[in-house]
Structure formats: structure tokens, C-alpha cells
């Protein structure tokens, strides 16, 4: 089997930003390539993240496209890191943007969520409560909700497979949001391209494994993201990808096909994961 195409996170961020900026201006790829003096195939490779665009070329393209100063600064801060295998992403607008871009590059997304419902499976009420009760409030609330909405729509479209591994304690801590959130999980689990599995909290060895999302194409893992309160860490180092891929497999083996606690879930069968 061929190795997966690994695109470093900063490369993905810069390339997608160049492509989005060009499309917003309504300029065709060939026209822009002619204006900046490069071959269309070269510009296409930069926009797809197949090749790393030199920082000088990135600056020239952004200037020609007349992007706003905040966007210019954000992209130019990433440009020197374009070849790095890993990235700590601190830029607010990019938090959802890079995550979404990797999802689009994937044929399967595997998420391990030991302590909370995964973003893509949250009801709006659950998401709003999480944002409103955060230890440190910030101004990302509306942007965060919009990003989730876009990604949830993509999940419903069925363009890729999703596997969600949820710690059972998460389901016990829903309080007054319980019924609506459980119904939402049930509905999602009925989709042919979505698998939801519950991992028992009695699995002591799993308690030290923090949340992560693994992105895969048909050849294997292409990136993993570790999400934090003020930033995201994206990893594409092949050794680390292999380890997280192995961890995801181990979690799947230990997950339950049947509900862990019927009394807590208030239903005879929450999720049956047979796919």
C-alpha cells in the first residue's frame, strides 16, 4: 500500500489561505499565475499544499489580492513554518479553519473524547453551555458555533467516514441536557458513515490518554490534532502518527458495543456500533 500524502500543518494553512483569498477576489488561477510570473501548475501546487510556497511568493500573492492586514499577518506568520512537521496554532480564526481543512483532506476521521461530547455530535444547547461556562471567557463564541455548524453539515453530507470514541463518564454528566443530547447521539449513530462507540471508564489504562482527533486518507493517517483551550497542536510526524493510529485501534478494541450504564442513559440501547 502506498504511503499517505503528508501535508505539514503550516503548509496546509498557508495553501488553503492563498486559495480562499484568490477565490474571494474572483480571480482565476491562470490569471493570477500570469500576474505574479509563475507557471499555473506551480501556483496550483502551492494552493493544494503539494509544494511549499516561498515566503516571498506568499507575501507577493497576498499583496496582489489585497487581503486585510490581520489576514496578511496571520498567513505570513505561518509561512516560515511551512515545512515543519508539527504546529502549535494560536491564531483564533485559524483554529477552526485548519481543522476543517484537514477534515476535507480526509476519508476518515477518528475522534477520542474521554471527557466531553465531540464537537460534531453536540447539540447547540450543549455547545453553548460549554462555551458560556468556560474557565476563561474569550471572544470566539460566535465564530466557534459557526465553525461547528459548518463541520456538522459536512458530517451529515456523508462525504467521509467518522468514528467517535466517547468516554462513558461523559454521558453521565449531561444533567438537564441529557435527553436531547442522547437523542442527538442516537440519530447520528444511525448514519451509515458514522460509528459511535462508548469506552468504559473502568479501563484504567485509558485514563491517561488525552483527547485527540486523527485524520486519515485511504492510505493511512495524515495528521492528528490535540485541542487545547487557547490553541491547537497539529502533528504530522510519521512516527507520532503511527503511534496515535495504534492508540485509536486500541481504543476501538476496548470500546463497548452496548451501553455501559443503561440506568444512566435512560434507554435500553443508546448506540449499537456494528460497522
Describe each PLM feature range.
Residues 176-275:
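C-terminal regulatory/effector modules of DNA-binding transcriptional regulators
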Residues 2-25, 29-34, 41, 45-173, ...:
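Interdomain hinge/linker segments and adjacent boundary elements that couple functional modules
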Amino acid at each position: 500500500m502506498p504511503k499517505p500524502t503528508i501535508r505539514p500543518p503550516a503548509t496546509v494553512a498557508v495553501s488553503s489561505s492563498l486559495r480562499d483569498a484568490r477565490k474571494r477576489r474572483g480571480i482565476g488561477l491562470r490569471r493570477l499565475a500570469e500576474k505574479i510570473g509563475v507557471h499555473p501548475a506551480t501556483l496550483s501546487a502551492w494552493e493544494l499544499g503539494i509544494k511549499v510556497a516561498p515566503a516571498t511568493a506568499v507575501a507577493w500573492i497576498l499583496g496582489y489580492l489585497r487581503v486585510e492586514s490581520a489576514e496578511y499577518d496571520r498567513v505570513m506568520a505561518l509561512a516560515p513554518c511551512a515545512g515543519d512537521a508539527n504546529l502549535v496554532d494560536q491564531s483564533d480564526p485559524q483554529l477552526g479553519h485548519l481543522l476543517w481543512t484537514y477534515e476535507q483532506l480526509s476519508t476518515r476521521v477518528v475522534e477520542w473524547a474521554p471527557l466531553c461530547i465531540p464537537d460534531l455530535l453536540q447539540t447547540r444547547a450543549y455547545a453553548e453551555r460549554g462555551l458560556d461556562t468556560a474557565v476563561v471567557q474569550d471572544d470566539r463564541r460566535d465564530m466557534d458555533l459557526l465553525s461547528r455548524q459548518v463541520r456538522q453539515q459536512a458530517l451529515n453530507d456523508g462525504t467521509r467516514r467518522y468514528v467517535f470514541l466517547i468516554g462513558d463518564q461523559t454521558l453521565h454528566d449531561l444533567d438537564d441536557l441529557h435527553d436531547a443530547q442522547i437523542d442527538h447521539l442516537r440519530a447520528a449513530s444511525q448514519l451509515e458513515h458514522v460509528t459511535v462507540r462508548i469506552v468504559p471508564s473502568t479501563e484504567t489504562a485509558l485514563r491517561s490518554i488525552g483527547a485527540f482527533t486523527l485524520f486519515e486518507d485511504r492510505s493511512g493517517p495524515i495528521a492528528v490534532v490535540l485541542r487545547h483551550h487557547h490553541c491547537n497542536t497539529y502533528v504530522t510526524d510519521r512516527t507520532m502518527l503511527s503511534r496515535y493510529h495504534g492508540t485509536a485501534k486500541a481504543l476501538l478494541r476496548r470500546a463497548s458495543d452496548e451501553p455501559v450504564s443503561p440506568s444512566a442513559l435512560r434507554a435500553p440501547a443508546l448506540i449499537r456500533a456494528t460497522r
